[in-house]
């Protein structure tokens, strides 16, 4: 397996400056416990990505940063403890990373999680050839969708 990949990364944001580059030697991430490695097939561009690019999110991620919240891809590696996914599974990612323990999560309002994060904002996102994602955030793509 390749050890490096291409990724579109932000190198500077805010103060009227945005530096966005295609980097060709980014290390391929390794999935940890409960995570999978995805080969990204598609990643949408949405308002959250634009706000991140413009430095208008509450917390600016460390640079360089890979944005991209709307990810679809194929599982290419599973980390320890992952039993519900296999190499070759086609998936999409729910980008709302919730704790599952706070009052909002317990009532089903995971988008209001007290410790919530957004995939591609507080974590590396999908504007790359490969991305690591929590296995619990994946949804299976039906065969009827290409």
Enumerate the language-model features and the residues they cover.
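Short structural boundary motif marking the start of a folded domain
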Residues: 2-8
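Short polar catalytic/cofactor-binding loops
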Residues: 11-15, 43-45
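Flexible, glycine-rich phosphate/dinucleotide-binding loops
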Residues: 14-16, 59, 100, 111
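Short glycine/threonine/proline-enriched tight-turn/helix- or strand-capping micro-motif at secondary-structure
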Residues: 17-27
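Glycine-rich beta-strand-centered segment in the early N-terminal region that forms part
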Residues: 27-43, 56-105, 137-143
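Cytochrome P450 core scaffold surrounding the K-helix E-X-X-R motif
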Residues: 47-54
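Cysteine-cluster motifs in flexible loop/terminal segments that predominantly coordinate metals
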Residues: 85, 95-136
